[in-house]
């Protein structure tokens, strides 16, 4: 990853891209580029993450980061007969709230299946009348039914996705989403992603983290007021020994 970044930057100033290239030289050069604020070379370096067990609510937040590529599990073609859902920690910690939450999810599953079955029963004879075979009519009716039934599914519904971002976009993502003011689910995800990035390419992410780790808090009156503790926590994250293989 560092070599790719170095090649991208030196292409602007040299005829030969690979002359004298070494990991030590690349790391030093990346540090110099970061100090100078010259970030375009790191756009040539990308990381791809496989993410599971997150909610559709998180999906709505992460896809706001437009300099990224996303592939998300479809609710249009994947039927959620008994969907998995995410439970917020505050709800899980409250017995009465948790009971109400799980009851609501069970009712939602029942409503989803009832809607899907009813719509499928409506669409099936229509497709038969159009000349489809029984098998084709059944398949088309189910797909069309779950396409509309999915509207009843909650934000808590679990989804899976692949996300690819370049280093520059990731740094910005971490500034915003590792912040204490970010919603808990995407903050936890961003912190786990940062750990993986630091293990894979520490030189590229040595200063990555919430904005207060690079300077003052940009949140003004809405600051969490815990800047010292946040800086200490992310300093420990960066200091942790690497356990990942760099690919």
Language-model features: locations:
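Single conserved hydrophobic/aromatic residue that forms the stacking wall/gate
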Residues: 1-8
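Generic secondary-structure signature for well-ordered alpha-helical cores
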Residues: 110, 114-117, 121, 154-158, ...
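Long, amphipathic alpha-helical surface segments
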Residues: 163-247
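A glycine-rich, charged low-complexity "G-patch/RS-like" nucleic-acid-interacting patch
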Residues: 32-143, 152-155
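Short linear interaction motifs
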Residues: 23-33
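Flexible, glycine/charged-enriched surface loops at secondary-structure junctions
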Residues: 126-128, 145-146, 203-209
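Active-site loops and adjacent core secondary-structure elements that bind or stabilize anionic groups
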Residues: 11-12
């Amino acid at each position: 990853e560092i070599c790719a970044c170095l090649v991208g930057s030196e292409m602007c100033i040299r005829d030969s891209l690979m002359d004298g290239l070494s990991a030590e030289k690349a790391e030093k050069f990346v540090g110099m580029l970061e100090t100078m604020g010259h970030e375009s070379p790191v756009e040539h370096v990308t990381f791809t993450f496989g993410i599971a067990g997150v909610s559709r609510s998180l999906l709505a937040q992460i896809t706001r980061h437009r300099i990224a590529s996303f592939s998300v599990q479809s609710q249009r073609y994947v039927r959620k007969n008994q969907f998995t859902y995410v439970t917020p920690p505050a709800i899980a910690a409250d017995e009465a709230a948790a009971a109400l939450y799980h009851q609501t999810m069970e009712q939602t599953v029942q409503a989803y299946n009832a809607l899907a079955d009813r719509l499928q029963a409506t669409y099936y004879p229509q497709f038969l009348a159009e000349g489809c075979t029984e098998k084709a009519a059944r398949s088309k009716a189910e797909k069309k039914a779950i396409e509309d039934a999915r509207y009843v599914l909650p934000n808590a519904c679990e989804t899976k996705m692949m996300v690819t971002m370049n280093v520059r976009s990731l740094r910005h993502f971490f500034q915003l989403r590792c912040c204490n003011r970010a919603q808990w689910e995407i903050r936890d995800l961003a912190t786990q992603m940062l750990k993986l990035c630091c293990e894979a390419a520490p030189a590229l992410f040595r200063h990555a983290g919430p904005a207060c780790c690079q300077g003052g808090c940009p949140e003004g009156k809405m600051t969490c007021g815990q800047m010292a503790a946040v800086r200490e926590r992310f300093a420990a994250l960066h200091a942790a020994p690497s356990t990942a293989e760099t690919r």
